[in-house]
A protein has these predicted regions:
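An active-site-proximal beta-strand-loop segment
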Residues: 1-43, 51-55
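A broad, low-specificity signal for short, low-complexity segments enriched in glycine/proline
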Residues: 4-7, 44, 167-169, 202
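An acidic- and aromatic-residue-enriched active-site/binding cleft used to recognize and process polar
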Residues: 19, 35-37, 47-51, 87-89, ...
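Active-site beta-loop-alpha junctions of metal-dependent nucleic acid enzymes
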Residues: 23-25, 45-72
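Glycine- and acidic
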Residues: 41-46, 190
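Extended amphipathic alpha-helical interaction segments
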Residues: 64-265
Length: 265
């Protein structure tokens, strides 16, 4: 993983997410990934007992302490240009505290999923026949070409639905206030390389669970630590060699299918 930090891509956009269900004690695993011509590559792994802001903040600071001076493509302790995450406030607050110069972006998929869930929450009183039309307007906000289109769409929402659904108007006002985090037209100055979702880190968790842990739970923390450091690094090293030697099909098979027999640790 240390060698991945030498790539220029490591200093651009870093994808961060957490998952669980990998050991019998319920530890949480955080992955920091970057894009590369060979696909997603890991920059760091954190294993913690919880996802509270204090714990995550401490974990990120410990990670900074072991990173090389030229980490994140030579940017060092300043961190990458931006992080892309889902809307986990504790995680985002911790990232902002540890790497204050980095910009925080929201995954487009999770943004729209959150709006969809809000519309389907019965407490908000949105009629079923209106949810799809309102969702289409939310998508217009996210995929707008400029801020003028965002303002026009917000006026349209207020005109058509504001009086009927005051909670919706209030929700979308708060949503629009965070446009710097989710609007695609406002991240053109960031080298996202077309990645506006957290798919890279989501697929990395599939690799970890399928090809490294073989859909089983680690027996204890030591075994989990070995899996997310030594075994995971070996997997990506083999895949990088496959891509370098022109064996892309082998690299894809390696990521998509787990071996039938588990290797002894």
């Amino acid at each position: 993983m240390e060698r991945v930090h030498t790539l220029p891509d490591a200093g651009e956009v870093v994808f961060v997410d957490a998952s669980g269900g990998m050991d019998r004690h319920g530890q949480r695993v955080f992955l920091l990934m970057c894009w590369s011509p060979a696909g997603g590559l890991p920059l760091g792994v954190i294993v913690s007992t919880s996802e509270t802001e204090a714990v995550v903040d401490k974990a990120f600071r410990l990670l900074v302490g072991i990173l090389p001076d030229g980490a994140f493509g030579g940017r060092g302790r300043r961190g990458p240009l931006c992080f892309m995450t889902d809307d986990c406030q504790a995680e985002r607050n911790a990232l902002s505290a540890v790497w204050p110069e980095a910009r925080l972006l929201l995954c487009t998929f999770h943004v729209l999923q959150a709006v969809w869930r809000w519309l389907h929450n019965g407490k908000h009183g949105i009629d079923k026949q209106h949810r799809q039309a309102i969702m289409a307007l939310a998508k217009q906000l996210v995929y707008a070409n400029n801020e003028a289109e965002i303002a026009t769409t917000m006026e349209l929402v207020a005109t058509e639905w504001g009086e009927r659904y005051p909670l919706l108007d209030q929700y979308l006002q708060g949503f629009a206030a965070r446009r710097q985090e989710w609007a695609l037209c406002l991240r053109t100055d960031v080298p996202t390389r077309g990645h506006n979702t957290n798919n890279i880190v989501e697929s990395a968790f599939r690799v970890l669970k399928d090809s490294v842990l073989y859909r089983t739970r680690a027996f204890n923390l030591l075994q989990l630590f070995d899996s997310v450091t030594v075994q995971l690094s070996k997997h990506y090293a083999r895949r990088a060699c496959d891509v370098t030697n022109g064996r892309q099909r082998a690299a894809l098979r390696r990521s998509a299918a787990a071996p039938a027999k588990k290797r002894a640790l």
